[in-house]
């Protein structure tokens, strides 16, 4: 194949790698955002449970205790309802990272191939030059005799 074809292929692989890396970063950021929000909601639920226990120990009204308990349960339910989304984003993040790594490896492989090809061509060129120089020297030696 011509060098131009390999250059275009290399550019395409670079673009593909850049896109997949950017996508991986976006998905990872979204996963972190949703996971942190979910952890924050769970933290609030624990805080309300602690407050509920303190209020119960202090003899707060039943209505107030029920309100605090219900709010804590609602927070837990919210956190639990988001768990599938968190897991889906975690999976998407892993897949996007794997794709980015594969694309980077493809690019690295092509670059390695092109470097070896360039070295091989350089060696052939040098070998050809050496042969031409030998021929010139041999011709000079033959003309002197």
What are these regions (language model features)?
Residues 1-145:
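Charge-rich amphipathic alpha-helical interaction elements
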């Amino acid at each position: 194949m011509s060098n131009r074809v390999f250059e275009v292929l290399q550019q395409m692989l670079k673009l593909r790698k850049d896109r997949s890396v950017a996508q991986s970063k976006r998905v990872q950021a979204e996963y972190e955002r949703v996971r942190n929000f979910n952890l924050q909601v769970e933290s609030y639920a624990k805080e309300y449970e602690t407050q509920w226990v303190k209020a119960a120990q202090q003899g707060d009204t039943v209505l107030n205790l029920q309100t605090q308990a219900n709010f804590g349960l609602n927070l837990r339910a919210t956190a639990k309802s988001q768990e599938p989304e968190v897991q889906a984003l975690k999976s998407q993040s892993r897949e996007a990272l794997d794709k980015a790594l594969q694309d980077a490896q493809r690019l690295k492989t092509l670059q390695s191939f092109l470097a070896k090809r360039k070295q091989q061509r350089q060696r052939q060129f040098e070998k050809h030059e050496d042969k031409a120089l030998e021929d010139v020297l041999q011709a000079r030696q033959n003309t002197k005799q």
